[in-house]
């Protein structure tokens, strides 16, 4: 049954406050007729610094056009939008703190102003999950429009992908690559706008938003510069008005079943390891506090790798788009999905994908023809990670599926990089980078260390990286991250010593510090650590003191 305007949030009366708002809106030039329309927030994370978001102002105009034509009043508001690639060098690292802030911004702006519905525009790593967390928290009609993937660059007559340029960082540092070639790759490997064209966190989160039903079908595999994505933005504006009138809210879309659908798709496409932080956080905001890492682990036993996309594979997101995109991917995965989940367009997952076509069955494979029987991601447990740790299995060299090595321990990313550059890390070492977790240092990424290690093939093909910090969505190699509990919480990771042996068995999903239980407990009793925060600004101190564990999604514990 269609809701009347009188029943909508923006029409609720608050006496003098209502008249004040009415007067202020009229003073800005809005008409009485416009003020009698449903009020729709266009939550636009556009800015001029983030290449994934620099074009969202154009998409927002199309969204607003659709809202107006469908009888609503669109009002554009903003949120923070930090580009992961712009802040990678800063060891403080602010992606996860910014994600939580973005969800808070959505709550305060949209709820405080009594909008009837919202369309949220975002593309990149922390912004898409922040917007989805805000949707789940407020539980009003909402659609997410993701900004599309970045066009491939061209260099010396060939298309190039950014991840291949990043692979050369270590070689350039050691003088093993021609500077002109390197600089040319850096200059031409990124297109004008959109999410970086591999399964980094940006594209991974866009795909998860679609997999859980919060975008219109096909959104996550559209080019940022295509006519299709502008058309979709307009249709999102039309559709949000239908959702407002029908009373369809975010928590009718974001359910335990739809989150499981997203996890299944994540396994099939080897999405970013950062999803193990974001999906549990979104679920929490919707009211579902399940042991989500165990769900990831269970799903890894039933969903193999079906699309071998970069960085671990050979195909770009553009290749994925041309092969049929997300609708085709989900159609072939339907036996592992809940096809009855509702999506924002009013149709079920099954209805949305039933007519999808696969144009390249090597890029989008079926369950009976996987790239590998292992999933994209895996959860490793053991005495070194009692609550779990995450590895991108699809990007691990085959010879490192079973590993045992001696620890080289570093209490910061800076210390690890100095040792690597000084030649103090040797073949087969287990490089332990700790106090980089959410409380220790805001979820610092070990991406820089990993990229420089990649420039030393002998080390890259024999060493392990083990950290309570995170990895970029472009992670590869034997890289175990998100070790939980983190070192700052007096965990087993905090008491690892140089030359301790560490064993990683990926098929068995285990990670083991090879010391006795008695020795481990004795070391833990002696360990003490306290966060001072004196070197950080106020918000980061606030984050460190109030954030929860990696395994629970890094949500506020307040």
Predicted regions and their residues:
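A short, small-residue-rich loop immediately preceding and capping a beta-strand
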Residues: 110-131, 143-146
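Catalytic or ion-coupling anion/metal-binding cores of large enzyme and transporter domains
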Residues: 1-54, 59-81, 85, 91-95, ...
